[in-house]
Amino acid sequence: MTIKEKNNYIVNRDISWMYFNRRILDEASNETNPLLERLSFLGIYSSNLDEFFQIRVATLGRMIELEENMHPINTNSKKVLKKILKLNEDYTLDFETIFMDLKSELQKENIFLVNELEMTPSQEKCVDSFYREELMNSLFPILVSRMSVEPKLNDKSIYLAVKISNTVKHEKNDKKEYALIEIPTGEFSRFFVLPKEGEKTCIMFLDDVIRYCLPYIFAQLNHDKYEAYTIKFTRDAEMEFDNTAYESVLEKVSKGVKSRRDGLPVRFVFDREIPSDLLRFTEKLLKIDKRDVHVCGARYHNLQDLISFPKIRRSELKYKNHPPIPVRAFEDSINLISLIRKKDQFIHCPYNSFDNFIRLLRESAINPEVKAIKISIYRLAKNSKVIMALICAALNGKKVTAIVELLARFDESSNINWATKMRDAGIKVILGIEGLKVHSKLAHITARKGNIACIGTGNFHEGTATVYTDFTLMTAHKGIVDEVESVFDFLEQPYLNPTFKQLIVAPQYMRKKLISLIKTEIDNAKEGKPAYILCKINHIVDSKIIEKLYQASNAGVVIKLLVRGNCSLITGVPKQSENIEALGIIDRYLEHCRIMIFANGGEERYFLGSADWMLRNLDFRVEVYTPVYDTDLQKQLKTVIEFGLKDNVTARIVDGSGKNLINYTANETPFRSQEELYNFYKRNYEYSFIEIEKQIT
């Protein structure tokens, strides 16, 4: 395939990301979702967009500068950025429309978002008290028209840009003042719930509470007119390291985290009603220039806070409660290590509880036959029970080794703190490998009667395990367990070059193995044997993998994909990808599993692991896929993919067009895969309970 042909059949990764985030925005307008969950989708959309500008748009800006120095006209990055900004402009207008629609829907439920001009006298009295008793001493206005030192502003915060003047001109005090007030959302909720009046629940943005209090805040200035407009800016958050400096990885990452405060602005968002003089003054203060992205928006920004909208006691406006379903085998066992030795086990979070994994670590920490525990760590919960179990094991005399990836984006500081705590407890901590991110999710437990290993698709993080769908395989299969230990040997001694027969490991072998697996399907299709690929993954953007999938499609291989995020592959193109279908599911849980099933001529091969089909995962990270041999677990993986492909409520067609049409045919019975999967697991658990009772009686 020539470069020109590739460009025709591959969507740019950043544009495909915009299409993905649009699917989240679409769920905010999806009336099958409960009302307060639709607000949450707006928050998720906003949060994602912030990070996208911090990393990807900032990177595009640097690439444009580089390309302009080489080829000044029509750089490719410039075209991509132009397309992104046009999509962002369109999506921003849709976001505002959806938000206003949801406000109207809230009013039908007697929930009102009121501003500073819409309060009743009793509500004003309540806000007065809140300001004087709690809020006042957390507000530190900067009179920017008088300041002598340039302020260090936080791009994670939102600010009110305030213009202070007089309604009637005074000879002695006719000077306008400009001020900035950081809205203290780190200390207070973004939303202030007013006392209930009858059946009405009234809620204010903290921004509006502060607007109401401006006469109190600036009382000493002797002005009587206050205009306040929300602004937000985003800095370049990519970290750069001086590899010539003689510093430890820990020191380099610590410096990199601090340097984010000095990153150049890449986006400036402001209220479209802001007066031109205040806008110019603010731009000058923040050093915003014409090259930075300007987003002219509505009254409120940083709406990621909608994720934490007040918990109103209206259960019908939220998702139905889905408590984790117990794993029957775990319930019936007092020794998980012995259980796993007898038969491979799965936990599928959040359908099953992550507590099962913590239980395994806790049991290992006190089990006399356990000698050592090794684990790879990418992201951790704020109060990590995983770390507590590892520390417990170390204190009980076990040899504990933790591979901690310091460069897990935006979790660097947290991982540095945890690494320090573990070292203080006597745990051997290895801070990754220079030049390679350790993204694999592995644990290895050495025990006298036989070792076991855990291989996961997601982080060992009890927080995200309640909202991310992830599998963890627990196995005593000797070939797999020994090779997991070999991965840890490599992480401890990167000069080693281990070989693998069971695991698919990046960066050494994964790309080559994936290409080989796809080629086998191509060969089988040509020979008339069963040939198909079923895959559930987060992102597909690697051009070489996509090219091989196109070849497979042309050879007659049926390819069905569930792709949550970026998808650079274009489906349904005649003589190119007509045998490829792709769906993206956005629902109450974030789809995070990576599962691969290959027909293999009728003897299916099953894999799960940590890697997406991206250049970074295949060539620049330590990633692991494991085969799944247990037939019961294979059936479970197949069910997950089949349910996803059948979804016609939250699954959208991912074909490269960005239309994101729902995967629905007229007169179909609604099938929501996450809901159906939960019910499936629940029925299986209840059925197993009934069978046990029958045996007892």
Regions from the language model: what does each represent?
Residues M1-I533, Q551-A555, G565-Y589, C593-T697:
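N-terminal localization/anchoring segments of enzymes in phospholipid and broader phosphate metabolism
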